[in-house]
Amino acid sequence: MKSLWLHGAAIVTATGSDPEQAGILLEAGRIARIGGAAPRGVEVVDCAGLTLTPGLIDAHVHLGMASPILDSVGYGMSVAEIAADMFANCARTLRTGFTTVRDCGGIDAGLVGVVASGKIAGPRIVQCGPIHCQTGGHGHYASEWEPAGLWSGQEIPGLRTLAMLADNPDEMRRNARESFRRGADFLKLCVTGGVISKHDKLTDTQFTSEEIAAAVAEATARGTYVTVHAHNVAGIRNAVLAGVRCVEHGTGIDEETAALMAERGVSLVPTLAAVEAVIRNGLGLPSEFAERAAQVRQAMVDGLLAAKAAGVRIGLGSDVIGPDQSRRGEELTLRAAVESPMEALIAATRVNAGLLGLDSEIGTLEVGKRADIVGFAGNPLEDPKLFADPESVVLVLRNGVIVS
């Protein structure tokens, strides 16, 4: 692996320090030095006019849902088409500056393996395998006339399994063990209704405390954790009291619930971009889903602010689904409007790295860290709309190798 000197850019380290003009020396896939002069004989990469940040991390993706939604979950397209869309989505995700992702439901470890091997381009992937849901709950996408016994989670072995059903603690325990057998890094449960749900309401709570606790016990036994999809306070509290360590979406979190999350060390990953995408273009779905998205938009922001005030660790995830996931960076733009551009960037880098347990390796531009670096044409801290524009990402390095 050749050494590189990145020259002429403004550097945003995401450590909390102000941006600075400095060169970066990359050796053996890691950051060897920041500042000083270029060593003799090293290859120089001209980064004049760019802003360099740590590689972005999306803590809530669905790489396996990269096709038209209704066709993809209803046998409306071939396995070959689904696979092609997934592979293209992986490459696009990396190209737009996301060097690491946490997949929150749908892919199998086989996809992780082919990306890690270099057979297809893509980000570093941490994944939960299939979503865990109850019969008729969020994630059970079967039509109402389809017998529940026929549901297999749209399983494509080695590529994609959307969801597994459990209706008692023993079934949850078996499904959790099966997920880990297949290579899951953590577990995700749906504990409330969802925006894109056929059979439930946003106000529904799902899974009993005993069912959630069974999943938590299996994850804890393996040194990992459970995160939950949650759009109402009752579901969030049930999950937190059962021992989960992270909440996705977090719609409607109030002060009391935020305090409980902070006390128990539970993190939050809001997903504003997915809500905006459903409201803006519908994703080819029935109009009722856009109406649901409109219901959660402000409540999710309110939950974020309540959690922030309580001192909850807050990551960043896009949750975008469907054929066009190129604008997942819009999550940073939306967060910048709620907080600040720097806070949004730090959430998408340093905070997310900690949430994934990778903060010793990635998340900041520091000596010794892996050289995952993104170059923006312009300064997204001054113009946060650049985060949402994939064309503004003009340089991507992963492990010290230029990939875009």
Feature-to-residue mapping (PLM):
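N-terminal metal-binding scaffold of metallo-dependent hydrolase/deaminase domains
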Residues: M1-P39, L50-L52, P380-D383, V401-I402
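Divalent metal-coordination and catalytic microenvironments
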Residues: A9, I24, G29, G49, ...
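C-terminal cap of metal-dependent C-N hydrolases
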Residues: V12-T13, A348-R350, G354, V367-S404
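Active-site metal-binding motif and surrounding structural segment of the metallo-beta-lactamase
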Residues: A37-T53, A80, F180
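Metal-associated gating/positioning segment near the N- to mid-region
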Residues: L50-S117, T135-A142, E210, A234, ...
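Metal-coordinating catalytic core of metallo-dependent amide/deamination hydrolases
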Residues: K119-E288
